[in-house]
Protein backbone atom coordinates (compact mmCIF):
# COMPACT_ATOMS: atom_id res chain seq x y z
CA UNK A 1 0.00 0.00 0.00
CA UNK A 2 1.31 3.42 -0.90
CA UNK A 3 -0.13 6.82 0.00
CA UNK A 4 1.23 10.35 0.13
CA UNK A 5 1.69 11.80 3.60
CA UNK A 6 0.66 15.33 2.59
CA UNK A 7 -2.92 14.51 1.56
CA UNK A 8 -6.10 14.33 3.65
CA UNK A 9 -7.93 11.04 3.02
CA UNK A 10 -11.61 10.49 3.82
CA UNK A 11 -12.49 8.09 6.63
CA UNK A 12 -13.59 5.22 4.36
CA UNK A 13 -10.62 5.51 1.99
CA UNK A 14 -8.76 2.38 3.09
CA UNK A 15 -11.94 0.34 3.50
CA UNK A 16 -12.97 1.23 -0.08
CA UNK A 17 -9.57 0.11 -1.34
CA UNK A 18 -9.82 -3.21 0.52
CA UNK A 19 -13.43 -3.89 -0.58
CA UNK A 20 -12.48 -3.23 -4.21
CA UNK A 21 -9.51 -5.56 -3.87
CA UNK A 22 -11.70 -8.36 -2.46
CA UNK A 23 -13.90 -8.07 -5.57
CA UNK A 24 -10.88 -7.82 -7.91
CA UNK A 25 -8.13 -10.06 -6.52
CA UNK A 26 -4.84 -10.14 -8.40
CA UNK A 27 -5.47 -6.55 -9.50
CA UNK A 28 -3.69 -3.38 -8.36
CA UNK A 29 -6.27 -1.05 -6.78
CA UNK A 30 -6.06 2.74 -7.13
CA UNK A 31 -8.19 5.33 -5.41
CA UNK A 32 -7.21 7.83 -8.11
CA UNK A 33 -6.09 7.10 -11.66
CA UNK A 34 -5.81 8.44 -15.18
CA UNK A 35 -6.60 6.63 -18.41
CA UNK A 36 -3.49 6.37 -20.61
CA UNK A 37 -4.08 7.57 -24.16
CA UNK A 38 -2.11 6.66 -27.27
CA UNK A 39 -1.47 8.36 -30.60
CA UNK A 40 -0.88 4.97 -32.21
CA UNK A 41 0.05 1.41 -31.31
CA UNK A 42 3.56 2.44 -30.19
CA UNK A 43 3.18 6.13 -29.35
CA UNK A 44 1.80 7.39 -26.05
CA UNK A 45 0.14 10.81 -25.69
CA UNK A 46 1.46 13.34 -23.18
CA UNK A 47 0.38 12.94 -19.56
CA UNK A 48 -1.77 16.07 -19.62
CA UNK A 49 -4.04 14.33 -22.18
CA UNK A 50 -4.73 11.41 -19.85
CA UNK A 51 -8.11 12.09 -18.24
CA UNK A 52 -8.86 11.40 -14.60
CA UNK A 53 -11.02 8.32 -14.19
CA UNK A 54 -14.27 9.27 -12.47
CA UNK A 55 -15.93 5.88 -12.09
CA UNK A 56 -15.02 2.23 -11.65
CA UNK A 57 -13.19 0.84 -14.69
CA UNK A 58 -12.61 -2.78 -15.56
CA UNK A 59 -9.07 -3.91 -14.78
CA UNK A 60 -6.74 -2.61 -17.47
CA UNK A 61 -3.09 -1.87 -18.13
CA UNK A 62 -4.24 1.57 -19.28
CA UNK A 63 -5.48 2.61 -15.82
CA UNK A 64 -2.57 4.63 -14.44
CA UNK A 65 -2.62 5.07 -10.63
CA UNK A 66 -1.67 8.51 -9.41
CA UNK A 67 0.29 7.85 -6.26
CA UNK A 68 -1.18 10.81 -4.38
CA UNK A 69 -4.52 9.04 -4.10
CA UNK A 70 -3.08 5.85 -2.66
CA UNK A 71 -2.59 2.48 -4.31
CA UNK A 72 -2.94 -1.08 -3.03
CA UNK A 73 -0.35 -3.47 -4.43
CA UNK A 74 -1.03 -7.10 -3.52
CA UNK A 75 1.98 -9.38 -2.87
CA UNK A 76 3.94 -10.24 -6.02
CA UNK A 77 1.93 -7.80 -8.17
CA UNK A 78 5.08 -6.02 -9.35
CA UNK A 79 8.03 -7.23 -11.38
CA UNK A 80 11.14 -8.15 -9.39
CA UNK A 81 12.82 -5.24 -11.20
CA UNK A 82 10.93 -2.94 -8.84
CA UNK A 83 13.90 -3.26 -6.48
CA UNK A 84 16.45 -2.09 -9.08
CA UNK A 85 17.18 1.23 -7.44
CA UNK A 86 19.76 2.28 -10.03
CA UNK A 87 17.37 1.73 -12.93
CA UNK A 88 14.58 3.56 -11.08
CA UNK A 89 16.86 6.54 -10.45
CA UNK A 90 17.97 6.53 -14.08
CA UNK A 91 14.50 6.34 -15.65
CA UNK A 92 12.10 8.12 -13.31
CA UNK A 93 13.72 9.38 -10.11
CA UNK A 94 10.88 11.74 -9.21
CA UNK A 95 7.91 9.71 -10.47
CA UNK A 96 7.49 6.58 -8.40
CA UNK A 97 3.92 6.15 -9.67
CA UNK A 98 5.33 5.81 -13.21
CA UNK A 99 7.83 3.21 -11.98
CA UNK A 100 5.22 1.21 -10.03
CA UNK A 101 2.78 1.27 -12.99
CA UNK A 102 5.46 -0.09 -15.33
CA UNK A 103 6.49 -2.75 -12.82
CA UNK A 104 2.87 -3.90 -12.60
CA UNK A 105 2.42 -4.04 -16.37
CA UNK A 106 5.73 -5.88 -16.84
CA UNK A 107 4.42 -8.44 -14.34
CA UNK A 108 1.13 -8.72 -16.30
CA UNK A 109 -0.88 -7.16 -13.47
CA UNK A 110 -3.84 -4.97 -14.44
CA UNK A 111 -5.09 -1.96 -12.48
CA UNK A 112 -8.57 -0.84 -11.48
CA UNK A 113 -10.10 1.97 -9.41
CA UNK A 114 -12.38 2.07 -6.43
CA UNK A 115 -16.08 2.65 -7.20
CA UNK A 116 -15.87 6.38 -6.55
CA UNK A 117 -12.31 7.44 -7.41
CA UNK A 118 -10.88 10.56 -5.79
CA UNK A 119 -11.36 13.50 -8.13
CA UNK A 120 -9.83 16.22 -5.99
CA UNK A 121 -6.93 16.08 -3.58
CA UNK A 122 -6.86 18.14 -0.41
CA UNK A 123 -3.32 18.90 0.65
CA UNK A 124 -2.27 19.33 4.27
CA UNK A 125 -0.25 22.44 3.30
CA UNK A 126 -3.00 25.00 2.72
CA UNK A 127 -0.51 27.29 0.92
CA UNK A 128 -0.04 24.63 -1.71
CA UNK A 129 -3.78 24.08 -1.87
CA UNK A 130 -4.40 27.69 -2.89
CA UNK A 131 -1.23 28.01 -4.98
CA UNK A 132 0.67 30.56 -2.88
CA UNK A 133 3.67 28.48 -1.84
CA UNK A 134 6.93 29.48 -3.49
CA UNK A 135 8.69 26.17 -2.90
CA UNK A 136 9.31 23.80 -5.78
CA UNK A 137 7.32 20.66 -5.10
CA UNK A 138 7.55 17.27 -6.74
CA UNK A 139 4.03 17.87 -8.08
CA UNK A 140 5.00 21.20 -9.70
CA UNK A 141 8.20 19.71 -11.17
CA UNK A 142 6.31 16.83 -12.73
CA UNK A 143 3.53 19.11 -13.95
CA UNK A 144 6.11 21.22 -15.83
CA UNK A 145 7.06 18.31 -18.08
CA UNK A 146 8.86 16.05 -15.63
CA UNK A 147 6.16 13.38 -15.84
CA UNK A 148 6.25 13.30 -19.65
CA UNK A 149 10.03 12.88 -19.70
CA UNK A 150 9.96 10.07 -17.15
CA UNK A 151 7.02 8.32 -18.85
CA UNK A 152 8.90 8.41 -22.15
CA UNK A 153 12.01 7.06 -20.41
CA UNK A 154 9.96 4.06 -19.24
CA UNK A 155 8.34 3.43 -22.62
CA UNK A 156 11.66 3.81 -24.46
CA UNK A 157 13.62 1.60 -22.09
CA UNK A 158 11.03 -1.19 -21.96
CA UNK A 159 10.15 -0.99 -25.68
CA UNK A 160 8.81 -3.20 -27.20
CA UNK A 161 7.97 -5.37 -24.17
CA UNK A 162 5.65 -2.93 -22.40
CA UNK A 163 3.84 -2.04 -25.64
CA UNK A 164 3.50 -5.72 -26.53
CA UNK A 165 1.88 -6.55 -23.18
CA UNK A 166 -0.61 -3.71 -23.61
CA UNK A 167 -1.27 -4.48 -27.28
CA UNK A 168 -1.73 -8.22 -26.64
CA UNK A 169 -4.55 -7.34 -24.27
CA UNK A 170 -6.23 -5.64 -27.26
CA UNK A 171 -6.92 -2.52 -25.21
CA UNK A 172 -5.43 -0.09 -27.74
CA UNK A 173 -7.63 0.51 -30.76
Predicted segments, located by residue:
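Conserved catalytic core of nucleotide-sugar-dependent glycosyltransferases
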Residues: 8-86
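Generic secretory/membrane-interface signal
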Residues: 1, 24-26, 91
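Short, flexible active-site loop motifs that bind/organize anionic cofactors or intermediates
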Residues: 4, 68, 90-91
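Glycine-rich, histidine-containing beta strand-loop boundary motifs that form or position
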Residues: 4, 32-33, 115
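Short beta-strand-to-loop acidic/aromatic patch adjacent to the donor-nucleotide binding site
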Residues: 1-8
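C-terminal catalytic/acceptor-binding lobe
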Residues: 80, 85-173
Amino acid sequence: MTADDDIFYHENWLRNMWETYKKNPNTIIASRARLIKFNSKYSVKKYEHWKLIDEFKSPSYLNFPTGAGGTLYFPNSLSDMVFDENLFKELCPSADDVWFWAMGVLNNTKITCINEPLKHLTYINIGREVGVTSSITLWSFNKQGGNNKQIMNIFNYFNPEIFDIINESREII
